[in-house]
């Protein structure tokens, strides 16, 4: 029998003089333990990754060679008997200490949750209707909440005799309480996607929106997925391999802010405490962003080769070196936001093999294939920009969807025949094609690599063992029964039926069922993918395509099908991520369940309330010439997409112009099988084992609006971080996630201050450094061919 002791979290700025120790008893037969440790050693010795032994304790040296972060490898043993996580990135960020006696369910937790959810949801909703828009990142809430919580912890310790459970000062502001507030804000502060649907319906389809309908649409589209998140915990949240890398940045930030322990660890010669390191990075990042973000924006879009008089209007030069509509062949920037635009998830938390797979895909499809097809004028590509997120008509203007609508906003085929076919830039088409492949590849990959584990965990949720964090969590806290999540899901699906059937949505109930099934069927494969790689496959395109064939010429139905077919899964996976964060922070799962539902209800009410107020109090809202920029660009994009994707029959069916893209569904099936066969047949072929087909297909999914320029920057930074990891592993383990938290929080706070205090009131700084990068073909999204007035391009018949 072995015993692991964990000291309590420090509740104050100074270490507690009498830390609580909570023993965990782990029973195991000595023979099994010896055999297990022997298997661990054999597994580690068989791995080929090199490590830096300097400044690392012997226990961590045993497991550092096996890392999802470095090689995408999954621990094959049983982590039940390990004293810490088998993954070094988790060990370096997440503490195994816990004090379950810390009280969290008190007025201050709920007060801070309410205030931050209301403020962040309201501000983000307000600016979501403006272009350029502003979204305040939850990292800002995580940083700002800390001093406010510490101030509230200074209140006198008054109690009320009539309310015995009330205490004005429930104790020190702990990192657990901080985590509860942050988790609530992270899930609900961003504008609910349903609000873009409501904006499109109300402002562009002129639909009279009942307030009850708006609440139901927002709540159901978010909380149906919560049920799926809870019911799939055994596959998506609980396993040790479900790292959810993005959460490690938040964990490191909590630890940096709250821990005042004397750090004796020497990391490659560095002794600086992580808290001080975080503050230095945070302040430096905040101050520096003012330079590329406002004072000298040319340092952000650093296409310096195009600043000369001979290159700025040279189409070939702009195609090669352009940062906005070109290939970005000179990937240099002084602005971190250009890096973060590339992939979902922080570069500090994204495994290097994910960055490598993604960049390989970008090089093949967008640096090699795209220029070849563009300059051969395939599918009339030269009449459109090289990279663009817009669609065009046959006069090179952006496609005006209102020209093909009836008064009831259904599509009029006669008007479509009279107007123009839809032309899509090749960058957008490649993004569609890769998404088609990714949707299939994620299923094939999941079956091949995780199928047995999925079946085994279905039969026994503890199959494969539990790591130290899950053991602590399950011993110290009561879990939420599955029936809680099942009941939540049933209730929300029922309310979803009310929303789509009792109001004039033009969305049949059977289509609602199919949309929900798409989200639920994709949940486990997508959850496993995101938990390990920090990436996910967007279902927006495939749901629009499916609905376009099921319910052709019905754009209103297309809106709601995408909402329930994609956002239900997306929001559910966001909760899965936060459930993992709650496990890392050792916060009661029952409290998290209650807080998340409460925060979602409150944020939905705030979203709807703010948008309704704006509709009635801002003149010219959602018009293109609104003087303050409240043009509803997001709602307009959703509106346009719903109409265009109601016409897939005329774009992707047999004999139509873009039909060859449908072959990528087959590629998505065959490519993972081929890679798996090579890995199985040639196990010593190191290159093959690093190929991850879902990531390869879905990684470049942000192009457009991102460009290869952004992806080159992301890969370069990821490469440097991985080099540091290999050369100075101790330093990387101690400071990497803290550095990521400091950089991203500093930039996020700086963006908010610049926008609210300078740009929104009308402040401008017009000089050469802020204008030179705009005087290029790259910024103008120049086309290779320019038609004269009255000319058209394309084919004669498109129906």
Swiss-Prot record:
UniProt-listed InterPro entries: Oligpept_transpt (IPR004648), OPT (IPR004813)
Compositionally biased tracts (Low complexity): 13-26
Superkingdom, taxonomy of origin: Eukaryota
An example Gene Ontology molecular-function term: oligopeptide transmembrane transporter activity
Subcellular location: Cell membrane
Primary location: membrane
Keyword Glycoprotein: yes
Segments on the Extracellular side according to the record's topology features: 1-108, 157-177, 232-276, 335-359, 450-482, 530-540, 612-659, 758-799
Matching Pfam families: OPT
Record topological domains on the Cytoplasmic side: 130-135, 199-210, 298-313, 381-428, 504-508, 562-590, 681-736
Glycosylation sites: 46, 640
Annotated transmembrane regions: 109-129, 136-156, 178-198, 211-231, 277-297, 314-334, 360-380, 429-449, 483-503, 509-529, 541-561, 591-611, 660-680, 737-757
Membrane topology field: Multi-pass membrane protein
Annotated GO biological process: oligopeptide transport; protein transport
Keyword annotations of the record: Cell membrane, Glycoprotein, Membrane, Peptide transport, Phosphoprotein, Protein transport, Transmembrane, Transmembrane helix, Transport
In-chain residues carrying the UniProt-annotated modification Phosphothreonine: 48, 50-51
Record has Transcription as a keyword: no
Gene Ontology cellular-component terms listed: plasma membrane
pH-activity relationship: Optimum pH is 5.5.
Region (Disordered): 1-26, 43-64
Entry similarity comment: Belongs to the oligopeptide OPT transporter family.
Chain's role: High affinity transporter for glutathione. Also transports tetra- and pentapeptides like the opioids leucine enkephalin (Tyr-Gly-Gly-Phe-Leu) and methionine enkephalin (Tyr-Gly-Gly_Phe-Met) across the cell membrane.
Extra information: Present with 2870 molecules/cell in log phase SD medium.
Protein's name in the database: Oligopeptide transporter 1
Naturally occurring in which organism (per UniProt): Saccharomyces cerevisiae (strain ATCC 204508 / S288c) (Baker's yeast)
Gene that this sequence comes from: OPT1
């Amino acid at each position: 029998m072995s015993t692991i002791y964990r000291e309590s979290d420090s509740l104050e700025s100074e270490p507690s003089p009498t830390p609580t120790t909570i023993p965990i008893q782990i029973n195991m037969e000595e023979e099994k333990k010896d055999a297990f440790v022997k298997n661990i050693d054999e597994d580690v010795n068989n791995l080929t990754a090199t490590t830096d032994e300097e400044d690392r304790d012997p226990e961590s040296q045993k497991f550092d060679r096996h890392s999802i972060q470095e090689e995408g490898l999954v621990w094959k043993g049983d982590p039940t008997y390990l004293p810490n996580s088998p993954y070094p990135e988790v060990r370096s960020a997440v503490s195994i200490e816990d004090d379950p006696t810390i009280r969290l369910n008190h007025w201050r937790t709920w007060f801070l949750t309410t205030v931050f959810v209301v403020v962040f949801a309201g501000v983000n909703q307000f600016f979501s209707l403006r272009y350029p828009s502003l979204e305040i990142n939850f990292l800002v809430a995580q940083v700002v909440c800390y001093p406010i919580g510490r101030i509230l912890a200074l209140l006198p310790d008054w109690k009320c005799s009539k309310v015995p459970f009330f205490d004005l000062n429930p104790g020190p502001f702990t990192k657990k309480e901080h985590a509860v507030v942050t988790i609530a804000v992270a899930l609900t502060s961003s504008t609910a996607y349903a609000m873009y649907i409501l904006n499109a319906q109300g402002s562009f389809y002129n639909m009279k929106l009942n307030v009850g309908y708006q609440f139901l649409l927002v709540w159901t589209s978010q909380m149906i997925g919560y049920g799926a998140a809870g019911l799939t915990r055994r596959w998506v949240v609980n396993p040790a391999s479900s790292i959810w890398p993005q959460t490690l940045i938040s964990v490191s930030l909590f630890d940096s802010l709250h821990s005042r322990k004397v750090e004796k660890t020497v990391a490659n010669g560095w002794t600086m405490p992580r808290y001080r390191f975080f503050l230095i990075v945070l302040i430096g990042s905040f101050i520096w962003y003012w330079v590329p973000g406002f004072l000298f924006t040319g340092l952000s879009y650093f296409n310096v080769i195009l600043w000369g008089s001979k290159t700025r209007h040279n189409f070939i030069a702009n195609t090669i070196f352009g940062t906005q509509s070109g290939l970005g062949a000179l990937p240099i920037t002084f602005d971190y936001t250009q890096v973060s635009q590339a992939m979902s998830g922080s570069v500090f938390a994204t495994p290097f093999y994910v960055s490598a797979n993604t960049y390989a895909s970008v090089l093949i499809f967008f640096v090699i294939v795209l220029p070849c097809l563009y300059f051969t004028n395939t599918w009339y590509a030269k009449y459109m920009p090289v990279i663009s997120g817009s669609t065009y008509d046959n006069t090179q203007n952006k496609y005006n969807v209102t020209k093909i609508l009836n008064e009831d906003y259904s599509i009029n085929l006669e008007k479509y025949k009279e107007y123009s076919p839809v032309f899509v830039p090749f960058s957008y088409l490649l993004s569609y094609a890769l998404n088609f492949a990714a949707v299939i590849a994620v299923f094939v990959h999941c079956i091949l690599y995780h199928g047995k584990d999925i079946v085994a965990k279905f039969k026994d949720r503890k199959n494969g063992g539990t790591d130290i964090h899950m053991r602590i969590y399950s011993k110290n806290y009561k879990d939420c029964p599955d029936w809680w999540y099942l009941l939540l899901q049933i209730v929300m699906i029922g309310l979803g039926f009310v929303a789509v059937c009792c109001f004039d949505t033009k969305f049949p109930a059977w289509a609602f069922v199919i949309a929900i099934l798409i989200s639920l069927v994709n949940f486990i494969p997508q959850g496993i993918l995101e938990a390990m790689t920090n990436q996910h496959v967007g279902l927006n395109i495939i749901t629009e395509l499916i609905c376009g064939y099921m319910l052709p010429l019905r754009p209103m139905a297309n809106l709601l099908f995408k909402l329930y077919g994609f956002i239900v899964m997306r929001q559910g996976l966001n909760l899965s991520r936060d459930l993992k964060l709650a496990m890392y922070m050792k916060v009661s799962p029952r409290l998290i369940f209650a807080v998340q539902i409460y925060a979602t209800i409150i944020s939905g009410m705030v979203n709807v309330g703010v948008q309704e107020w704006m509709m009635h109090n801002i003149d010219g809202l959602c018009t293109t010439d609104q003087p303050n920029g409240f043009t509803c660009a997001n709602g307009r994009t959703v509106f346009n997409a719903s109409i265009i994707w109601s016409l897939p029959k005329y774009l992707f069916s047999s004999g139509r112009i873009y039909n060859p893209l449908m072959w990528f569904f087959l590629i998505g099936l065959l490519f993972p099988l081929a890679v798996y066969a090579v890995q199985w047949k040639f196990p010593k072929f190191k290159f093959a084992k690093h190929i991850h087909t879902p990531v390869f297909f879905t990684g470049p999914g942000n192009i457009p609006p991102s460009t290869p320029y952004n992806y080159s920057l992301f890969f370069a930074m990821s490469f440097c971080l991985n080099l540091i990891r290999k050369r100075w592993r101790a330093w990387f383990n101690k400071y990497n996630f803290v550095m990521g938290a400091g950089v991203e929080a500093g930039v996020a706070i700086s963006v908010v201050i610049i926008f609210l205090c300078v740009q929104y009131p009308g402040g401008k700084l017009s000089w050469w450094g802020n204008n030179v990068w705009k005087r290029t073909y790259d910024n103008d999204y120049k086309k290779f061919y320019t038609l004269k007035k009255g000319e058209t391009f394309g084919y004669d018949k498109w129906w």
